[in-house]
């Protein structure tokens, strides 16, 4: 150990001495090398600051180019993505357009092993069904879409177009006997939508004659256009001047419904129909509506019901006529069939024929046609045929009852005949009270004459108005008629008065009061306005009796008796046109 330590110490002692032993030449060489390195470093250090600026610029430009390329790359990616989507869409469109056409069929029933019985192309076929279609969910009569291989690939809706036929009867629950336009009978299946509907004979059905299916019940538009089902709101109290006629029709219509037990006890048959006849505008239609309203209320009270229900079938007479043979008769059958259905639960039903003479005129009187020869028997068979009319009342209205077929007017059909006459002075007062009510504004001067009593003022106004209308003075003279036997008679405006004319007079006076309020600012109705309205109303009617047949005009106007051959106007302040014979009268116009 001592020898080793001494050697290391000797080595340390000898190292510095060796460095100092280098020659000056060697040291000078090393100094030169170091000076060269220092000079080189100084040169590199001198040129280094000038080279960083271009590099920085290059770096900035490179970064900008990189950003621009990134943006372009993103835009290209979006464009390529959109182009790919468009290509896919175009491919789908091309594939869709390249597909073969699809056919349709009608589902009849489910077959074995997931097949379906389908009617397509005029044939009944058993077709395979796509797994996407559930056969159990298909309904009879439903439309199915078929591919080119006649495989059911989709369930569609039921058909909504086809032929309209009339139902004659339902056969065995899922089949029906229908009649077409040419009276061709056909048996069809009932589609699923009709299975839960209570069908009745006479219903209109939409059918597919090729597939043999009926799809839906079509509203009977021909009957809907002719029949207005309503519960009228007209009461007897709204009708003026017809107290006696109202009493007659109440005895004929209401008593059999309200006291049916007494009728059975006395073995008295209720009347089947009522004829209301008389001049136009005298309240025939109003009475018929009031009958329906009153009867409904009394029957409801008799049964202890709070709500009253009745049906008023208002038949538009002239629109019953149809150019096709048998169509008018069929419509009449449908109307009475509906009436029987409504009345089956004891609800009173009124079938109202307005202008009855236009449809049921005397057989054999037709000039250009003889439709009445079959229409009249159809009505007679409905009124007193095999099927009785329980709780159904037929009411007819006409101003030419002489033209209605006598078979309709005989007892047992239209049993009760009520004449609705033109109102006399007392009836006119009653009618005026329906339109001149205390709620109307009255002129202060007229009201002051009666001490502010509105009711007394209105009564006085009505009295003045009625006296002006019904006095037989020269200013109220209207016509001079000459009968076939040579007798002459002067007719006054009062002879042609009606409830409609009274309403028109009141309306004229009210309009005059409104115009006076606008001009003067004073509100209220005056008696002078009523008198002026009478003059205007008479002046408008003076030229109306100008029909070529005065005798026909007299029948409509309510003047019966000897045949009229001449008519001469006697209106004051107007030159007379002279007498007019039947064969010389011209310029036919409205009936008064």
Curated annotation (Swiss-Prot):
What's the short name of a Pfam family annotated to this entry?
AAA
This chain's function reads: ATPase which is responsible for recognizing, binding, unfolding and translocation of pupylated proteins into the bacterial 20S proteasome core particle. May be essential for opening the gate of the 20S proteasome via an interaction with its C-terminus, thereby allowing substrate entry and access to the site of proteolysis. Thus, the C-termini of the proteasomal ATPase may function like a 'key in a lock' to induce gate opening and therefore regulate proteolysis.
Family listed: Belongs to the AAA ATPase family.
Q: What is known of its domains?
A: Consists of three main regions, an N-terminal coiled-coil domain that binds to protein Pup and functions as a docking station, an interdomain involved in ARC hexamerization, and a C-terminal ATPase domain of the AAA type.
> Is the keyword Membrane in the record?
no
Coiled coil located at which positions? 25-99
* Keywords, alphabetical: ATP-binding, Chaperone, Coiled coil, Nucleotide-binding, Proteasome
Quick one: which residues bind ATP? Answer: 281-286
Instruction: List GO BP terms, alphabetically.
Output: modification-dependent protein catabolic process; proteasomal protein catabolic process
GO CC annotation: what is one?
A: proteasome complex
Signal peptide range in chain numbering: none
Q: Which GO terms describe its molecular function?
A: ATP binding; ATP hydrolysis activity
Share what the entry says about its subunit structure, partners included.
Homohexamer. Assembles into a hexameric ring structure that caps the 20S proteasome core. Strongly interacts with the prokaryotic ubiquitin-like protein Pup through a hydrophobic interface; the interacting region of ARC lies in its N-terminal coiled-coil domain. There is one Pup binding site per ARC hexamer ring. Upon ATP-binding, the C-terminus of ARC interacts with the alpha-rings of the proteasome core, possibly by binding to the intersubunit pockets.
From the Swiss-Prot or TrEMBL record, give the protein name.
Proteasome-associated ATPase
Comp. bias regions, Acidic residues: 1-11
In this chain, the stretch annotated as Docks into pockets in the proteasome alpha-ring covers: 591-592
**Which InterPro entries does this entry report, sorted A to Z?**
AAA+_ATPase (IPR003593), AAA_ATPase_domain (IPR050168), ATPase_AAA_core (IPR003959), ATPase_AAA_CS (IPR003960), NA-bd_OB-fold (IPR012340), P-loop_NTPase (IPR027417), Prot_ATP_ID_OB_2nd (IPR032501), Prot_ATP_ID_OB_N (IPR041626)
Q: In which pathway does it act?
A: Protein degradation; proteasomal Pup-dependent pathway
Name the segments for region: Disordered. Answer: 1-24
